[in-house]
Amino acid sequence: MARNKSRRLLWAVCLAALAAFAAAMVWLHYQQLCSPGGGSDPYTSDLGMHLAFAQRGMVYSTVSLLIGPAYALAGRIGIAVLLAAFHLAAVAVFACGLRTALPDAPRPARLLVSLVVNLATAVWMPRGGYWYQGTVGGTIYHNTTYIMLAPFALLAMLAFYRVWPTMRDDLDLRSYAVYTVLLTVATSFKASLIFAFAPALLVLLIADFVRTRAKNLKNEIIMGCSVFPGVALCFIQANVLFAEEGSGIRLIFTVPFGHHRMLWGPFNEAGVLGLARSFVFVAAVGLLLGRAAWQRFRYRFSLFTFAVSLAEALLLVESGERLYHANLWWGPFICFWVFWLESVSVFLQQTRTGAAPRWRLAVCAAALAWHIVSGVCFLVMLLQGVSYNVPILTYNLW
């Protein structure tokens, strides 16, 4: 009886927290949709621009097909509710990903942990640059396509983790089909994941080819074909997004530096500090819990995929009229979120088993708490009408 009462109480707390989060997302996104945009309004975001694209009939992703009917059904509040549902879906999928780290934890407990760790953003520190510009984080509140991509991208990665171990013997075709469909659906929202995942998978398949001495070629070819539907969608999207003459993707070294001052990356102080502020927790896990982390294929592959995405963002740039859009940086954001899941999983697993020294766990816990508190402050600022791209007040103080 007492156990059932505790379980019901846990569910009540979980549902109340999720409801509060959903309400905050609906209110924030409604304000963003009412914003005139242009960067000067405190609630400026990409939401209004994507709505305008859909209203003009510019269809380049599944997002365009969803926000139009949502707007026709209930106006801006309809889109806000739709985005809140995707936020909740991302929290739920992240909670599913935590199952390996918390196998005995009840579902509401995993949902609460997922919600809390997904509030995290780059840590705040004096003279730390911008709250957003220059940072890499997994949870985004101002971009329609990313918000809708997130749950499907993580579902695709979790499905990949399930099918990959079957490569050595008989490939599980049912799991393979589910993974391929999810990867394709994720790409239909935004190509950010597959743009890094496909090269990372290619390297993985080449390594498997060498290791098995070409004895697993059939499975390797089948697995490689899983990205083809998504890549085909990338070409369709590119025909819409890069329709202007001179638009495309080029190496950053071929673009005159004076015409493209990087918003992110190592070319300015805010970018360098932003990257440093983004990786406090994952660096702590990698350095202090590295042995346990590197034993997990999911951790190694998610880190490699993130490294590929970061290299692409630093070395490639959109050209033509999309020069300053910096859309290639959505790749590191979504891949970091996948890597964030594995870093959190390693930390929780080591905490549950007590396998690591307590001081190492304490350092990692402090780093995670720093991220979460910073993220809560950032979200409160957004709700209060402080634009996400406004520099923090202490930037030029010291």
Where are these regions (language model features)?
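Start-transfer (signal-anchor) and selected internal transmembrane alpha helices
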Residues: M1-L28, A105-S114
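Membrane-interface alpha helices of multi-pass inner-membrane proteins
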Residues: S175-A191, F197, L202
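Membrane-interfacial loop-to-transmembrane alpha-helix junctions, especially the N-terminal start
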Residues: L10-C14, P106-V113, L171-S175, L217-G224, ...
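Transmembrane-helix motifs of polytopic, lipid-linked glycan transferases
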Residues: V81-P108, L155
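Transmembrane helical bundles and short interhelical boundary loops of multi-pass, membrane-embedded
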Residues: V227, V231, F242-W398
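Perimembrane helix-loop-helix junctions
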Residues: F197-F228
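Short hydrophobic/aromatic helix or loop-helix immediately within or flanking a transmembrane segment
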Residues: D46-G78, A84
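Membrane-interface micro-motifs in multi-pass membrane enzymes
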Residues: A109-Y161, A326-F336
